[in-house]
Amino acid sequence: MRKLEERIMKDGLVLPGNILKVDRFINHMIDPVLFEDLANEFYEKFKDKKINKILTIEVSGIAIAYACGIRFNCPVVFAKKTSSKTLGDNCYRTEVFSFTKNRSYEVMVSKEYLDEKDHVLLIDDFLANGKALEGLIDICSQANATVEGIGILIEKVFQKGGENLRRQGYTIESLARIKGFTDDSVIFED
């Protein structure tokens, strides 16, 4: 999506270790007008699927998942990284590794909010190694829910997460596909 690529070029910052900082408009300060456009783009790509639920992982995926929930007119569920007294033990659980944080998390979703009747669109801000998505897919599998598709804002195609998931048969739509970085700029895939 050209609009997202232009915004990345304008406000994104390339950090050492192949990290793209987009906190000026995606994952710290949020541009709601841009997010509405991004949600509309995901809707166009997945409108023919039977989506009745959107699933993401906290924290950075929540904002775009929420915008998509409005556009798809369906509930949004997010996998929590921390347990609470209100969540209880009746949860689907899995472990995910965060590339950015360089650590593993146990994530969980209450069994109240996901089951075999659900046709799920997975939404996240980044796809690199694919570990967060593998965790969400595992949670859907535990719930016997159907993964209808995966929507990603920014995919680092030089890392193999997207390729591996596509090989497993998942439909992934990434709005910006990055094939690499130079010292201070982003190289997008054509």
UniProtKB/Swiss-Prot annotation:
GO biological process, one term: XMP salvage
Main location: cytoplasm
Record-listed E.C. numbers: 2.4.2.22
Catalytic activity annotation: XMP + diphosphate = xanthine + 5-phospho-alpha-D-ribose 1-diphosphate
Keyword Glycosyltransferase: yes
GO CC term (a single one): cytoplasm
Pathway entry: Purine metabolism; XMP biosynthesis via salvage pathway; XMP from xanthine: step 1/1
GO molecular function: xanthine phosphoribosyltransferase activity
Annotated positions binding 5-phospho-alpha-D-ribose 1-diphosphate: 128-132
Binding positions for xanthine per the UniProt entry: 20, 27, 156
Keyword terms of this UniProt record: Cytoplasm, Glycosyltransferase, Purine salvage, Transferase
The organism's place on the tree of life at top rank: Bacteria
Keyword rRNA-binding belongs to the record: no
Pfam families membership: Pribosyltran
Location of the protein in the cell: Cytoplasm
UniProt subunit comment: Homodimer.
PANTHER family given in the database record: HYPOXANTHINE/GUANINE PHOSPHORIBOSYLTRANSFERASE (PTHR43864), XANTHINE PHOSPHORIBOSYLTRANSFERASE (PTHR43864:SF1)
Matches recorded under HAMAP family: XPRTase (MF_01184)
Functional description taken from the UniProt entry: Converts the preformed base xanthine, a product of nucleic acid breakdown, to xanthosine 5'-monophosphate (XMP), so it can be reused for RNA or DNA synthesis.
Family recorded in the similarity comment: Belongs to the purine/pyrimidine phosphoribosyltransferase family. Xpt subfamily.
Record-given protein name: Xanthine phosphoribosyltransferase
